[in-house]
Structure formats: structure tokens, C-alpha cells
Swiss-Prot record:
It is found in: Spore wall. This is Exosporium protein A. It comes from the Bacteria. Its main location: other. GO terms for cellular component: exosporium. It comes from Clostridium sporogenes (strain ATCC 15579).
Amino acid sequence: MFLLYEKEDIYMAINSKDFIPRPGFVNKQGCLPDPVEITCIQVPKVFDQCLIKECLKPTDDCEQLCKQIPNITDPAQVRCVGCCKDLKVKVNSVTKCPVSNGKPGHKKVTINFTVTFDVDVDVEINGVIHTETLNFSVNRTITASNLYCPDAIAKTIIGKECTSAEEIDQQFIKLEVVGECLSTDISKIDCDNDCCSCSCTCEDNGDKKVFLCITLGLFIIIKCEIVVQLMVPAYGYCPVPEECKCSHDPCKEFMERELPTLYPPQEMDNLFDDYDERQDERHIHDRKHIEEEEERGNLVTSSIIASN
């Protein structure tokens, strides 16, 4: 078996014996050699999964998505609102109930979880800029109504030295969450007149408060996984990694860099409507034809004058 690799835009064949198995992308021009073994590995296998998208607005859950900005009473004191950072997810509970649809292994899975994240807000107090970090905690309950999540048949017991044996649950529900703060809004509340449901308590700093309200978007993937043994083709153990690269002189690297683009790309509308390139080619052809006719006319005129 031969492999192809790209070098200076020329595809050359190499023998599979010269190929060193290593992690990397398999390009279209390449062809992997035969594996050296078929081995048995134990891995979590995904039996079913589904995606849930949620957009949480302050109007739907003001208590969790709005936080008071301390030490200020006027929205004009807010100078900058940072991005959401340090997003973490904690699963509080998981319940699985069989679904009466005649299909074995299908279950209704309900998950309660909490998403926490921080937002930095720069505020001006007495002419000095301070950074306030607001801690948000959003509790949600989601349901996958028909997830194929069969029970594991084999039971696994792990015995540890000097400790009692421990039974391991081979089936588990995994939650993967990607969160994004879609928008931020600064709201001022007069607790004496228009106390809303956003935890309007007036025990500190007078009767006016400023709140930061977040619109939160969540991509949630629910997976049912079971630890199983699979046979897979393999190329042996992973190779020994390369030595860690030493840090270089940052000034030397900087001096070797090219000057970056000083200005961002512009977005402007076209001054003229789009035209048909074929029409433009016809226009050029007609213009050349006219010029050729004029040249012929000049030649004829010159010949007549010369004969006279």
C-alpha cells in the first residue's frame, strides 16, 4: 500500500512503511495504511442525543437574569459592560421514566441544572472608575420526552486496594451546555414608586437602584451514554510526544513580524448597479469595431488626397 503526500503542490507516493502513525487530519490525497491490530477498548458509547435551544429573557425570569449594580443610583454611571465569562454548569438532579410508546428502552429524561457566570461592569463613583463583578445563577429544568436510553445489562464492580468494592453505574446522562449573553440592558428602578419583581429591596443606598439585565441563549445537548467494550482497528500506542518548546525572546519575534493592517475592512454599498459582464464585452467589441471602421475611413481619405 502506498501513501500520497503533498509537497510543493506535487503529490508523491511513499511506502506505508515510511508512514509514522500520529494524530492529525487525514487529507483527501492520503490513504492510511492497514492497522497493526484490532483491539478491545472500553469507552462511553452515545446511544441517543438531542439538542434543546433556549432563549431566556429578563421579562420571563427577572429574578435570575437581573442583578443590582452596587454603589450606584444612576445608569449614567455605567461606563462599560463586559462579556459573560466563567460559565459553569452543575447538574442537580436527573429523573428517567419509561415512555409508554411500545418501544423498549425509550425514556422521558428530566434534568434540573444550574448555570453560573460572571459579568464585569465598569462604573464611575466620585470620578473614579471601579469594576464591579456581578454573579449570575440561572436554574433551569429541561425535558427530553423520548430519548433512547436502555438500561445497562452488565453490572460493573470495581475493587480498590484496602477499600470496599464499589458498584459503577454503566449508564449515565451527560449534559453539554454552550451559553451566550445575547444582550445587556441597564434598568433603573425607583423602589418607592415602581417596584418590579426584580428583587426590589431598598435596604441600602437610598430608594433607587440600577440593575443589569441579561438575555441568555443556551445550546443544550442531552446524551445517554453507556460504558461498553468495542473492537476498533488501531495503530498501537500513541507515539512519544515532542519536547516542549522553549519560550523565545518576545522582542525578537516582534521585530520579525510584518506591519499589521492599520485599519479594519470597510463595508460600503456599490455606487453602481451590477452589470452583465457579457454586455460589457459586447460594448468593448462594438467600440473596437467602430475604431476599425474609422481607421479604414482615414486610410481611404488619405489615398484620395494623395492621388490628387
